[in-house]
């Protein structure tokens, strides 16, 4: 399970962490706060650093969610390489649209 929280203290996520731990689910947390409950509960922590959000109160997750997207895209690319995930496998779960059409042509 992957959790993302800039401060790592999002109360809505903490009960889910407990359930995951009880079920033996591995936890990855992306956060700025390495001392936070989410970071402390994680098997793997990815430190995210955002100097400032774009809104005038520095409160809305604008810059941090953009950075999070980049982290997730990098993780996806790394996992595809690490696991040897193939285009044929992706085509099975994404059969439609231009991407599905292209993937299914390659799979033939």
Q: Where are each of the predicted segments found?
A:
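Internal, active-site/partner-interface "lid" segment
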Residues: 40, 54, 78-108
């Amino acid at each position: 399970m992957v959790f993302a929280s800039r401060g790592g203290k999002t109360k809505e996520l903490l009960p889910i962490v407990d359930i995951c731990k009880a079920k033996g689910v591995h936890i990855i947390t992306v956060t700025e706060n390495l001392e936070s409950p989410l970071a402390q509960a994680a098997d793997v922590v990815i430190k995210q650093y955002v100097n400032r959000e774009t809104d005038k109160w520095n409160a809305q997750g604008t810059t941090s969610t953009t950075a999070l997207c980049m982290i997730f895209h990098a993780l996806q690319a790394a996992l595809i390489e690490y696991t040897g995930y193939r285009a044929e496998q992706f085509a099975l779960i994404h059969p439609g649209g231009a991407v599905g059409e292209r993937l299914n042509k390659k799979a033939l």
